[in-house]
């Protein structure tokens, strides 16, 4: 961040195999690390942060856990995400939601997902082919602070449709409300109260304005 003279930015570390060997066997191949940083606004738009986004359930599904190491954040897996995202944008939506091979809700194309129903906040269990996101974990801690209980488990597609609130979490997406899924309005079609409370504290934390979570930050 300092090297690139940036104030607010996105940081992407990448670990990859070197050039000293061809083939599919990684043993003995040099490991390289690159870190990129660049200015980047709200991934799903400022309006998305404030008013919520429109999403669709993708025709593509997340990988089965026996196909690959689904809990790893590996570049090759993102072909699945690219297909889902491109399909959603082509059809006029902002983002997609993918189901797991059993038909349960997994995550967004690059984000974890939470829903609020009858006062209970729920998110898919990590057995649903989803990533154990850092922002997902951060929301757990924020919810403890707010005394909001979070339940991990299996979520069906129709639970999304009848939820009071739904939001996405991610390093790029931050906390982004969902106002519509498959042309069905979520709640009152606006950012929900619980989502707004979580979002407010999250942005206070990342900007260094929340004393309780100061330990999460590294000053530059």
Each predicted region: which residue ranges?
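Short secondary-structure junction motifs
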Residues: 6-10, 93-94
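Helix-start/capping segments and mature chain N-termini
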Residues: 16, 22-220
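Short, glycine/charge-rich beta-strand/loop segments that flank catalytic centers
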Residues: 1, 8-22
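Compositionally biased, intrinsically disordered low-complexity regions used as flexible
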Residues: 3-4, 59
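Generic structural signal for well-ordered alpha-helical scaffold segments
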Residues: 1-2, 85
């Amino acid at each position: 961040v300092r090297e690139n003279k940036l104030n607010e930015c996105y940081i992407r570390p990448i670990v990859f195999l070197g050039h000293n060997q061809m083939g599919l066997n990684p043993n003995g191949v040099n490991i390289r690390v690159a870190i990129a940083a660049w200015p980047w606004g709200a991934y799903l738009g400022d309006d998305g942060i404030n008013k919520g986004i429109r999403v669709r359930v993708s025709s593509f599904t997340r990988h089965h856990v026996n196909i690959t190491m689904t809990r790893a954040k590996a570049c090759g897996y993102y072909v699945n995400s690219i297909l889902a995202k491109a399909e959603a944008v082509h059809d006029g939506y902002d983002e997609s939601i993918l189901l797991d091979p059993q038909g349960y809700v997994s995550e967004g194309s690059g984000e974890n997902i939470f829903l609020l129903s009858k006062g209970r906040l729920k998110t898919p269990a990590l057995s649903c082919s989803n990533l154990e996101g850092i922002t997902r974990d951060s929301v757990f801690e924020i919810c403890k602070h707010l005394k909001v209980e979070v339940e991990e488990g299996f979520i069906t597609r129709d639970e999304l449709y009848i939820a009071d609130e739904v939001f996405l979490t991610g390093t790029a997406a931050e906390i982004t409300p969902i106002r519509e899924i498959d042309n069905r309005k979520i709640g009152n079609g606006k950012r929900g109260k619980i989502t707004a409370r979580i979002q407010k504290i999250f942005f206070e934390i990342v900007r260094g304005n929340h004393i309780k979570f100061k330990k999460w930050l590294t000053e530059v």
